[in-house]
Curated annotation (Swiss-Prot):
It is an enzyme of class 2 (transferase). Carboxy-S-adenosyl-L-methionine binds at residues 91, 105, 110, 130, 152-154, 181-182, 196, 200, 315. Belongs to the class I-like SAM-binding methyltransferase superfamily. CmoB family. Its EC number is 2.5.1.-. Catalyzes carboxymethyl transfer from carboxy-S-adenosyl-L-methionine (Cx-SAM) to 5-hydroxyuridine (ho5U) to form 5-carboxymethoxyuridine (cmo5U) at position 34 in tRNAs. One of its GO terms (molecular function) is transferase activity, transferring alkyl or aryl (other than methyl) groups. It catalyses: carboxy-S-adenosyl-L-methionine + 5-hydroxyuridine(34) in tRNA = 5-carboxymethoxyuridine(34) in tRNA + S-adenosyl-L-homocysteine + H(+). Keywords: Transferase, tRNA processing. This is tRNA U34 carboxymethyltransferase. It comes from the Bacteria. InterPro entries: CmoB (IPR010017), Mo5U34_MeTrfas-like (IPR027555), SAM-dependent_MTases_sf (IPR029063).
Length: 323
């Protein structure tokens, strides 16, 4: 059983304490009613992982943990087998005591694009919305954040996060809660809020931007990364049944339109800091994610288009401030 008690104790002593008015009841309800059919199998994989304290831990340049003495072949095999029980691994990579988890996404590439444009994360309390396995939260901690809180309702991601945390010596500087942002009260408590790869999955993108704003302190920073298309401030793609084989893609604006949306929601100092096409080197099938990936979603005769005929995935990073 994954225990959230450490997180409750942690926030009871800081400026997130008002969250305790609603959070424990939400988590108790989730534990009672909403668990996935494979959750016990996944949580058992976490439970059977060895307790290891890393001798060397690098979260600044990667997510890497090493022991003082090399682990035995049997210990490494045990870790690898248990981590493979948590496949598919989408966000990473992780290097843990000789087990190299080559995830579908090179999330480190995205982090390298985002990091130079951020306000200094030192001492900050951060919310990562749709955090997946938690890879970027560990990189936030490596960049000096005091506390990183991730929310993602996908229960496999929760177990992946807890598995990595256990192999990082049960590090309590990052926490993942199995919730969606619509379940959060307006906490107004985070110095930086990240929403990366979420906006296009929301039926109401402006409502999502308001929800993000409600989590920020005044003068807090929003980091927004999402799919975009080329065009002016009035250009928005509303895909039909699917986009790149995904059913749950609703709105893909131009970067300029997205800037206007942020302005409409009351954000200021809005900057488009990066725009790049997603490549099949950054998102691809691996031994740790063996099903279809980006190359299967693109037109085989014209990789500038999806199989549906839409522009191929292009992503923008925007940074804005809540006044």
């Amino acid at each position: 059983m994954i225990d959230f008690g450490n997180f409750y104790s942690l926030i009871a002593k800081n400026h997130l304490s008002h969250w305790l008015e609603t959070l424990p009841a939400q988590i108790a309800n989730w534990q009672r009613e909403q668990q996935h059919g494979l959750f016990k199998q996944w949580s058992n994989a976490v439970e059977f992982l060895p307790e290891i304290k890393p001798y060397r831990l690098d979260l600044l340049h990667s997510v890497t943990a090493e022991s003082e003495e090399p682990l035995s072949a049997g210990q490494i095999k045990r870790i690898e087998t248990l981590m493979r029980n948590l496949m598919p691994w989408r966000k990473g990579p992780f290097s843990l005591y000789g087990v190299n988890i080559d995830t579908e996404w090179r999330s480190d590439w995205k982090w390298d694009r985002v990091l130079p444009h951020l306000s200094d994360l030192t001492g900050r309390t951060i919310l990562d919305v749709g955090c997946g396995s938690g890879y970027h939260m560990w990189r936030m901690i490596g960049a000096g954040a005091h506390l990183a809180v991730g929310i993602d309702p996908t229960q496999l991601f929760l177990c992946q996060f807890e598995a990595v945390r256990k192999l990082l010596g049960n590090d309590q500087r990052a926490h993942l809660l199995p919730l969606g942002i619509e379940q959060l009260p307006a906490l107004k408590a985070f110095d930086t809020v990240f929403s990366m790869g979420v906006l296009y999955h929301r039926r109401s993108p402006l409502e999502h931007l308001w929800q993000l704003k409600d989590q920020l302190v005044n003068e807090g920073e929003l980091v927004l990364e999402t799919l975009v298309i080329d065009g002016d401030e009035n250009t928005v793609l509303v895909p039909g049944d699917r986009y790149a084989q995904m059913r749950n893609v609703y709105f893909i604006p131009s970067a300029l339109a997205l800037k206007n949306w942020l302005k409409k929601c009351g954000f200021v100092d809005i900057r488009i800091v990066d725009v790049c096409v997603t490549t099949t080197e950054e998102q691809r099938r691996t031994e740790w994610m063996v099903t279809e990936s980006l190359s299967d979603f693109l037109d085989p005769h014209d990789p500038s288009k999806t199989v549906e005929g839409y522009p191929a995935p292009k992503r923008a990073v925007l940074i804005a401030r809540k006044p």
